[in-house]
Amino acid sequence: MLVSMDFVGGPVGGVDYPRTYQEFRAWFPDDASCAAYLARLRWPDGFRCPSCDHDRAWQTSTQHWKCVSCGRKTSVTAGTIFHRTRSPLSTWFAAIWLITSQKNGASAKNLHDMLGLGSYETAWAWLHKLRRAMVRPDRELLTDVVEVDESFIGGRATGKQGGSTSKAPVMIAVENVGTEVNRKLRLGRVRLGVADAPGSKQLVDFARTTVEPGSLIRTDGARMFRVLAFEGYKHEYLSGYSAPEPGHVTLPGPHRVASLLKRWNAGTHHYRVEREHLQYYLDEFTFRFNRRRSTARGMLFYRLLQQSVNTDPHPLQELISRRPEANVDNDINLEPIPSNTYSEF
């Protein structure tokens, strides 16, 4: 069948989203409907051959097209996180719906149990593939008033006194929108990153890469931040290491975000989080936090699916081979406290 890739149906960003699981299943009942929608996301302006840029193709199977001009065969999943998957696309779509429609997301065990995946490792790998798709490399920088600070994820390791190497320093930048009439703090978007060591100059580089020049950056009194005033930023330091007021008063944004992050991570992911994969958990929190005010449940589904099409594949074996053994020193212990993640906002 000769096609020009004029796709119809399915959710359209900002226009229409599935409101319930029943609507989701009605739109995507089988692999053919899923593949057609992936093609629509991959080629929003119509099919373009990756070799010769021709705009006409023969559809040779549910997921494959053959260019009329040069004869190149193209799969709609090639180069995406679905590349060479042996699982049905409808199962992938169900996984994305499950992850995005739940307020606090899903753990690998949730995914494994609810979708009947072959193994826990498969569910774990799928989640990490999707987390890699949650952050766009070209995303906009934070603007206006931005508070920058660091916190720690983890608890005290068994048998250790004082500080613990199991705690990972996390860098936080968040837009402070102000306060409402009831004095409730209003926050904008957030950016998170894992630091190599606490209190390092890496936090200054983090501010440079996440905040738009010309914005006002608020930090603690560490001298390393003062260079920002000479690099196109307005800089205001509100506390020092011996400041009379605690950080949650002078820099309330990062402290509120850190509190929510710890509760979300502990409430949703009850297993140990490997330090080398922590950034991807932070990316998932960022994805959810920055869309927390959306009233359309399906909007997150649409955005993650859209970004999955534009994310390079990460083969299952690559993810598993890099996964550390359980109960090693690199793991981060999370206390099992209840999650009520975004209700304050």
Model segments located where?
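Residue-level recognition of single "structural anchor" positions
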Residues: M1-F345
